[in-house]
Amino acid sequence: MAFQDLLDQVGGLGRFQILQMVFLIMFNVIVYHQTQLENFAAFILDHRCWVHILDNDTIPDNDPGTLSQDALLRISIPFDSNLRPEKCRRFVHPQWKLIHLNGTFPNTSEPDTEPCVDGWVYDQSSFPSTIVTKWDLVCESQPLNSVAKFLFMAGMMVGGNLYGHLSDRFGRKFVLRWSYLQLAIVGTCAAFAPTILVYCSLRFLAGAATFSIIVNTVLLIVEWITHQFCAMALTLTLCAASIGHITLGSLAFVIRDQCILQLVMSAPCFVFFLFSRWLAESARWLIINNKPEEGLKELRKAAHRNGMKNAEDILTMEVLKSTMKQELEAAQKKHSLCELLRIPNICKRICFLSFVRFASTIPFWGLTLHLQHLGNNVFLLQTLFGAVTLLANCVAPWALNHMSRRLSQMLLMFLLATCLLAIIFVPQEMQTLRVVLATLGVGAASLGITCSTAQENELIPSIIRGRATGITGNFANIGGALASLMMILSIYSRPLPWIIYGVFAILSGLVVLLLPETRNQPLLDSIQDVENEGVNSLAAPQRSSVL
C-alpha cells in the first residue's frame, strides 16, 4: 500500500488538513512581510547638508531674520542642474551674492564646496524614522542600504541550505518552531539595533529564518495531503505571499516609524511559536526516519479529527510497516550530486533550469526591492505589486493547462524586459506610466517564475526532484541577492541596473527554448525515463501536473 493510499483512508483533505493549512498560511502572510520590509524601513528621504545659518536652533530666527528660508538655503547649498539643492555638498562659506541670483554663477568661478561634515537634514514628512535617518545612510554611505537588502537575501540562501538539511534530520515541526522563535527574537532586536553592522547581521539571521518558515510550511502542508490537492495547496501558499505584500503596504502606510514597524512585523512570531506546538509533525517524515510509533500516532490523530471512528482498527502497525517498506525503498534510491552531473541529459536540464531561475529571479527582485526608484508612492506600488502577483497566481493554472511551457515563458520574459527597458526612457514626472510599466513587469515576472517552477518539476524525475529543486532554488536565491546589490550601480549610471535586469530577462526567455516542451507530458519517475525521452514522447498525452 502506498503512503498516498494510506492518506486516502485518513482523509486526503479533511478537517484536520484544512485547519493545519489555514493556520500555516495565516502565519505565512505575516512572515512574508519580512521579504520586502526594507522598502519602508530603509526608505531614503529627501535630504541636504546641515548648515549653521539654517539649522542651528540656538540662533533665534537664524540671525539674519530679514531673509527667508529659501534665500538662506540658496546661499548655503549649491543647486544641481535641475535647480534643486544638492544632497551631499554645501558651500564652505555663505554665498551672499546669490541672494538676488537663481543659484548660478555667470562669469564667475564656482565657489568652494565641502561634504556634509556636520550631518544631514531630512524631510521627514513621509517617514519620521528609517534606518537611513538613524545611521545617515546617504551619499557615501548610501550603498549600505543595498547591503542590508543583500544580506537578508543572502540569509535566505543560507537558510535554504542549512535549515533544509536540519528539517530532513530533526523534523519539519521542530525546525519550523525554531525558525518562528529565531525570527521573533532577531526581528525584535533589529528594531533596537545600535549600529548598522548589528542591524545587517540580524537581518541576515531573519532572512535565514524566513526562508526556513516558507519551505517547512510548504512541506508540512504537502506531506499531509494527497497528490490531487497539492497543486491547490501550493497555489494557496503563493497567494499568501501576495496577500502578505498587499497588507505590508497597508501597514506601512499606517505605521511610518521604522522601529514600530519592525516590532509589528516580528512580535507576532512569538505567538506563532506558542501556537505551533499544536501543529502535527509530518507522518511521512516520521515513517521514513524510523519512527513508526510516532507516525502511527499522528495518523490516528488526523483520522479522528477527520471523523474516522475506527482509526485504531484500520491504522495498525502491520499496515504501517507495509507502507514503510515501499517508502523506505524509494528513500534509499539516492544519487549523489556527482552522479547526477555525469548523466548528460540530467546535467543539461539542471544547468539550463538553474540559469532560467537565476535570470528570471534577478529582474523580479530588482523591481520588488526597489520601489522608491520606480515611483514616489511606495505604499501604492507595494499594494499594486501584491495584487498583480495574486492575479498571476490565479491565472497560472489556466496558463499551465492551455499554453506551451517554453512559449509562455519566452513571451512573459520578453514582456518583462520590454517593461524594464521602457522605464529607463520614462521621466520621473510621468509617474502613472512608470507605475503601469512596473506593475505589468512584476505580473509577467511572477507568472513566468510560476511556469518555470512547473516545467522544472516536469523535466526532473521524481527520484531526484528534491535534490535538483534544491540546486535550482539556490541559484534563484543567488539571483535575488545580486538583484539588491546591482542597484548600487545607479550611483554611476541611473539606467544601468535596469538595463542589466532587462538583459537577464531576455536571456532567461532565450535559454528556456533549449529545454524540452513538457505540456501534456507524463511526469518522469526515474532517470531511465529521461534517457528514454524520445520513446516516451510517442506515448499518448496525459494530464500534466501543476506542481
Swiss-Prot record:
Origin: domain of life: Eukaryota
Disulfide-linked positions: none
Cytoplasmic side: 1-9, 167-177, 226-234, 281-349, 399-406, 456-470, 516-547
A Gene Ontology cellular-component term: membrane
InterPro entries linked to this entry: MFS, MFS_dom, MFS_trans_sf
Keyword check for Transmembrane helix: yes
A Gene Ontology molecular function term of the record: transmembrane transporter activity
Segments passing through the bilayer: 10-30, 146-166, 178-198, 205-225, 235-255, 260-280, 350-370, 378-398, 407-427, 435-455, 471-491, 495-515
Keywords: Glycoprotein, Membrane, Transmembrane, Transmembrane helix, Transport
Subcellular location: Membrane
Family from the record: Belongs to the major facilitator (TC 2.A.1) superfamily. Organic cation transporter (TC 2.A.1.19) family.
The protein's name in its UniProt record: Solute carrier family 22 member 25
Native species: Homo sapiens
Lineage: Eukaryota, Metazoa, Chordata, Craniata, Vertebrata
